[in-house]
Amino acid sequence: MRLVLFILLLPVCLATPFHQKGLFDFMLEDEGSADLASTDDPVISGFGPVCPFRCQCHLRVVQCSDLGLERVPKDLPPDTTLLDLQNNKITEIRDGDFKNLKNLHALILVNNKISKISPQAFAPLKKLERLYLSKNNLKELPENMPKSLQEIRAHENEISKLRKAVFNGLNQVIVLELGTNPLKSSGIENGAFQGMKRLSYIRIADTNITSIPKGLPPSLTELHLDGNKISKIDAEGLSGLTNLAKLGLSFNSISSVENGSLNNVPHLRELHLNNNELVRVPSGLGEHKYIQVVYLHNNKIASIGINDFCPLGYNTKKATYSGVSLFSNPVQYWEIQPSAFRCIHERSAVQIGNYK
């Protein structure tokens, strides 16, 4: 009986402990069995491109931000669609830095120390749509930017010139951000933006320009020129902007708006003229068909005319105002005729008072 029991327990004693196999184990096992089956066949690796040291790679997104990098990492995965290099110490973008990145759609270079971009650095990026160059030391935007670009953001640099050649062929750009640069009106070449047929949004805020740039494309729907040194608005500055819906001119030194200027922007819906030197409400608001929001607070407006905001007749079609700000002006609310706001149906839409 003891002999029979010993024979039954012997296989159990000799058995190895159970080990749960993962995917990696099976891959190794398959690789080993393949080697045993044929030693002449080449070994094909199952791993994808190697992620650059200290970077993180996931689903074709390569994140190399906040690493103190002084140059673009080498051997970036060729299937990368988004490359994040922000918050580093990169000083130069060289030819070949982005070789093989034919599928890159977005490149983030924000908050580095970039002062130079080689002429052919972006040449391989045939599908690049978004280029973020803000918070660097660039004095000019580079030429030969990819024709596929739809969005360029380069605020907070040292840009003092905008040449027409830089934007030539950039027919797909929709958004252009160039604020907080030491840019002057004399540094913007006449018609610099004319070739940008799809440009819809442009922001040149907090610079030293003294007038609205000339030759802006008619495709514009938003123009933001806040925080500059513009002293007046003339009709020529807004000429041809028939699709403009939002115009930002706050925090300038504007003291006058030429008669007829608003006729050049017939589809305007928002006008921001707060924090300027205006002494009267801009002419043309009453006859403007679509304007709904007008910011005029923090100016020097001392009186409101009965037809400044509303058309002469009651039967004239006009969009309803949703916001009119007049606070922090010398005009007193009791000096304003109630009929001056006859086309405004909501009392809360008008803000008056608080002048010191």
From Swiss-Prot:
- Glycosylation is annotated at 45, 208, 259
One GO CC annotation, please?
extracellular space
MF term (GO), any = glycosaminoglycan binding
Q: Please name the SMART domains in this protein's record.
A: LRR_BAC (SM00364), LRR_SD22 (SM00365), LRR_TYP (SM00369), LRRNT (SM00013)
Mark the LRR repeats by their residue spans.
70-90, 91-114, 115-138, 139-159, 160-183, 184-209, 210-230, 231-254, 255-278, 279-301, 302-331, 332-356
- Disulfide links within the chain: 51-57, 55-64, 310-343
- InterPro entries given in the database record: Leu-rich_rpt, Leu-rich_rpt_typical-subtyp, LRR_dom_sf, LRRNT, SLRP, SLRP_I_decor/aspor/byglycan
Keyword list, A-Z: Disulfide bond, Extracellular matrix, Glycoprotein, Leucine-rich repeat, Proteoglycan, Repeat, Secreted, Signal
Q: Where is the signal peptide?
A: 1-15
Q: Which Pfam families match?
A: LRR_8, LRRNT
Q: Which GO terms describe its biological process?
A: negative regulation of angiogenesis; negative regulation of endothelial cell migration; negative regulation of vascular endothelial growth factor signaling pathway; positive regulation of macroautophagy; positive regulation of mitochondrial depolarization; positive regulation of mitochondrial fission; positive regulation of phosphatidylinositol 3-kinase/protein kinase B signal transduction; positive regulation of transcription by RNA polymerase II
Q: Where in the cell is it found?
A: Secreted, Extracellular space, Extracellular matrix
Mod. after translation: The attached glycosaminoglycan chain can be either chondroitin sulfate or dermatan sulfate depending upon the tissue of origin.
Q: Which residues form the propeptide?
A: 16-29
Q: Which family does the record assign?
A: Belongs to the small leucine-rich proteoglycan (SLRP) family. SLRP class I subfamily.
Q: How does it assemble?
A: Binds to type I and type II collagen, to fibronectin and TGF-beta. Forms a ternary complex with MFAP2 and ELN.
Q: Which PANTHER family does this UniProt record tie to the protein?
A: AGAP008170-PA, DECORIN
Q: Tell me the function of this protein.
A: May affect the rate of fibrils formation.
What name does this protein carry?
Decorin
What is the scientific name of the source organism? Coturnix japonica (Japanese quail)
